[in-house]
A protein has these predicted regions:
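Polytopic membrane enzymes that build or remodel cell-surface glycoconjugates and lipids
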Residues: 1-243, 249-250, 255, 259-265, ...
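Alpha-helical linker/edge segments of TPR/alpha-solenoid repeat scaffolds
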Residues: 276-281
Length: 291
């Protein structure tokens, strides 16, 4: 009953709790249990029911939203995402609201990441008798695939917030490989990990003065124009038109595929308004592009 309550509370917090149900079934299968045994299925019915309700709610909220508009299937990014968030778990540096992602898919790095993804599958299979390793690995994988690929929207699929819950799976899997005789080592390393993430979180909060500050910080180590567009919108809403125009003109010159069509409509309408008095011809062109 306690696990059901915790699962329910987790679903209210984040859709990323939903893969927990699939992980439960996969654990039974990989550990050699009969997945569709009556007792096994009955024990999971409450989780399945709760997950179904929250899935319907999530789909209802997303049905009117524009999906990822890249010229490739977002599933091709899965190996890159798995490696990216894994790297951020162990090296939480240059954290951002949203990150650049590969624009050239079939590169050497893309091939290497796919090979690494296959190797990860072998590693999971090899440790299938380790329940904590299985749970952590599968929870991490299911979260990333569900939340950043299957339901990619708006700022997906590379953003810090998608890793908040997911990387717990990585640490559970990693710590499960430490022998039971090394409990002291586990406590020391675990304490250091918690301390590091506490310090990183504290450092990040220094940039949280307002949303404009967050996007400005993002521009210090991200090269795409997406952040300019998001910051420009905030400038425009605050009436800081000169700053907004500079950001919007940057994204006009270097368009970003993460922007949905309606965002470009907003951008060109704003540029049209801001250039009405200074350049009527250009303003008319902007309004025309907005439509």
């Amino acid at each position: 009953r306690a696990s059901i309550l915790v699962f329910l509370l987790g679903c209210f917090c984040k859709i990323q709790m939903l893969p927990f149900v699939g992980v439960l079934f996969l654990l039974d299968y990989l550990r050699g249990k009969r997945v569709f045994q009556k007792e096994t299925v009955y024990s999971k019915i409450p989780f399945v029911f709760i997950a179904f309700i929250f899935t319907c709610v999530a789909l209802q909220f997303r049905k009117d939203q524009t999906a990822f508009v890249g010229d490739y299937n977002p599933f091709l990014l899965v190996p890159s995402q798995i490696a990216w968030y894994g790297m951020k778990a162990f090296f939480p540096l240059n954290l951002s609201i949203v990150y650049d992602w590969p624009t050239v898919l079939f590169s050497k790095a893309f091939v290497a990441l796919n090979v690494g993804f296959i190797a990860l599958g072998f590693l999971i299979f090899r440790n299938r008798r380790n329940p904590l390793f299985l749970f952590g690995s599968l929870f991490y994988l299911a979260n990333i695939i569900l939340h950043t690929t299957l339901f990619t929207r708006f700022l997906g699929p590379y953003a810090d917030r998608y890793g908040y819950l997911s990387i717990l799976g990585i640490w559970i899997a990693a710590f499960s490989l430490v022998g039971q005789k090394r409990v002291k080592t586990l406590h020391i390393v675990g304490g250091l990990v918690v301390a590091v993430f506490f310090l990183v979180a504290r450092q990040q909060t220094t940039h949280w003065k307002d949303t404009i500050s967050l996007w400005s910080k993002n521009l210090e180590h991200q090269t795409s124009s997406f952040s300019n567009g998001m910051r420009g919108q905030l400038y425009f809403e605050k009436g800081m038109y000169a700053a907004a125009q500079r950001d919007f003109e940057i994204i006009e010159q270097d368009p970003d595929p993460r922007f949905e069509p309606e965002k470009y409509g907003y951008l060109y309408s704003a540029l049209g308004l801001m250039t009405t008095e200074s350049d009527g011809v250009k303003s008319a062109e902007y309004f025309d592009r907005a439509t």
